[in-house]
Every structure is written in C-alpha cells, then in structure tokens.
Amino acid sequence: MARIRKSDQVIILAGKDKGKRGTVLRVLDDGHLVVEGVNRVKKHQKPNPMRNIQGGIVEKEMPIDASNVALFNPATQKADRVGSKVLEDGRKVRVFKSNGEMVDAQG
C-alpha cells in the first residue's frame, strides 16, 4: 500500500523548500512526487503552433523524492509517519503513527 497518494497534504522535510506545505499532484513510479507550489523551476519552452503552445519561460513544478516529504497530520498540525492497519472487515487502511487515526476520512 502506498504511504503517500495523490491529493494528500504533505510537508517538505529537506531541500530548498523545507517546511513548505502542499498537495500531491502526481505520484511517479520511481518514488518521486510532484507537489503543488514546491520545487518550482523555470523552463524555456519552444513555441509549437501545431499544439497551440506559445513559447517563452514557463514556471512549473518538478518531481521531489518521496523520502523528502512527510504526510501532514491535521490533528497535531505537524508532519507524521504513516503505517497501515487491517480493519475488522478486512480492509487495509493508512494510519498516522503518532495518534493511530486513519489518514483517509472515509476509511
């Protein structure tokens, strides 16, 4: 089970954006995440009239390693580690290590 999923709130633990909070936009297969508003870089975009792309300098989010982020726990307002737990009905859910609450509200 993935510890961090799309649309999770995370806190950056290391790097130039340390301490920032953001939402996960994409989870890549190689263990990297794209987080909203974090690790923004300026890329030079070539114009492409076929795809209706205007050229220029574009600012976009680049992937960050999953080991440099931690899930945000709204109950404690801090970064928290994540574990998994099997419920009585057989479902496997993610839980916060600090207080044992479920990460997903719907379970």
UniProtKB/Swiss-Prot annotation:
Keywords: Ribonucleoprotein, Ribosomal protein, RNA-binding, rRNA-binding. GO terms for cellular component: ribonucleoprotein complex; ribosome. It holds the Pfam family ribosomal_L24. GO terms for biological process: translation. One of its GO terms (molecular function) is structural constituent of ribosome. InterPro entries: KOW, Rib_uL2_dom2, Ribosomal_uL24, Ribosomal_uL24_KOW, Translation_prot_SH3-like_sf. One of two assembly initiator proteins, it binds directly to the 5'-end of the 23S rRNA, where it nucleates assembly of the 50S subunit. Belongs to the universal ribosomal protein uL24 family. Part of the 50S ribosomal subunit. This is Large ribosomal subunit protein uL24. The lineage of its organism: Bacteria, Pseudomonadati, Pseudomonadota, Betaproteobacteria, Nitrosomonadales.
